[in-house]
Amino acid sequence: MRVLGIETSCDETGIAIYDDEKGLLANQLYSQVKLHADYGGVVPELASRDHVRKTVPLIQEALKESGLTAKDIDAVAYTAGPGLVGALLVGATVGRSLAFAWDVPAIPVHHMEGHLLAPMLEDNPPEFPFVALLVSGGHTQLISVTGIGQYELLGESIDDAAGEAFDKTAKLLGLDYPGGPLLSKMAAQGTAGRFVFPRPMTDRPGLDFSFSGLKTFAANTIRDNGTDDQTRADIARAFEDAVVDTLMIKCKRALDQTGFKRLVMAGGVSANRTLRAKLAEMMKKRRGEVFYARPEFCTDNGAMIAYAGMVRFKAGATADLGVSVRPRWPLAELPAA
């Protein structure tokens, strides 16, 4: 059984083909980073137009890469939300149209379920149950996962997501967009302990996050200490340490609350090396396991949508003839498979 996956929720056009016996057969990705760099962030209208230009050619490339034709595809999965409404509509329209033309089922996929299941693409996939840390530019959530579609929200950011805070602080430090990875690179040159940032909401019970205050703290620190290269690196180090420590503290609480021994982290920020190292060390001390996808599957991609589509297809999920998307779509609303 082979599923074509289409991802167009934001600023990456991702196309992949997944086979339930052979695994990933094709994976094509186009990033719009250069398109949006001059604006310092994603411009929704530009993103939508670029998806229109790139989606079909990438599908053709994926078929070529896999050596397959349309007749070999058993279902078409597409990201139906959450995300930018115009960008979502491009992928949904193409996906639904291809499914109709090829006479195969269309499978709407939740973008964050795609991220959550991305580690399943690895050679050593996690088993249920586990705590999932979904950490990206748009979301920071802790989820109790006991099966496909069996998701309980334990905590989430009440303001900025961790990835958004990374990008905003990077901009304050004079780094280009997207700044998160550049900030982490700069932080590696920083001196630990010169500056100490707060660990937001760790001094009270609960599993919610708040990262907007760290951006303000960074702005004040930059104002008071100047912007020479070493100072900027030290501020980047302090900021990254604060975010990573906050995520780690909340993960500990979630694991204690659920009693689970497995931690899965997914989303763009899960590619952060410092975060990976700290959580791996934490889980080793707890005699548990931590799982994450390879870096290219942490950011938005078609492979995770193709895989999630396969899982949902086997559970009987299909879309009707209409094209609909959900820019806001709580993960907990998904049905169990």
Curated annotation (Swiss-Prot):
Subcellular location: Cytoplasm
Keyword field contains Acyltransferase: yes
Cofactor: Fe(2+)
Cofactor stoichiometry and binding remark: Binds 1 Fe(2+) ion per subunit.
Catalytic activity, EC: 2.3.1.234
GO molecular function annotation: iron ion binding; N(6)-L-threonylcarbamoyladenine synthase activity
Transcription recorded as keyword: no
Residues noted as binding Fe cation in the record, renumbered to the chain: 111, 115, 300
Catalytic activity: L-threonylcarbamoyladenylate + adenosine(37) in tRNA = N(6)-L-threonylcarbamoyladenosine(37) in tRNA + AMP + H(+)
Class in the EC hierarchy, top level: transferase
Main location: cytoplasm
Pfam families in alphabetical order: TsaD
Any one cellular-component term (Gene Ontology): cytoplasm
Top-level taxon: Bacteria
Family membership noted in the UniProt record: Belongs to the KAE1 / TsaD family.
Purpose of the protein: Required for the formation of a threonylcarbamoyl group on adenosine at position 37 (t(6)A37) in tRNAs that read codons beginning with adenine. Is involved in the transfer of the threonylcarbamoyl moiety of threonylcarbamoyl-AMP (TC-AMP) to the N6 group of A37, together with TsaE and TsaB. TsaD likely plays a direct catalytic role in this reaction.
Protein name: tRNA N6-adenosine threonylcarbamoyltransferase
Organism of derivation: Escherichia coli O1:K1 / APEC
Gene from which the chain derives: tsaD
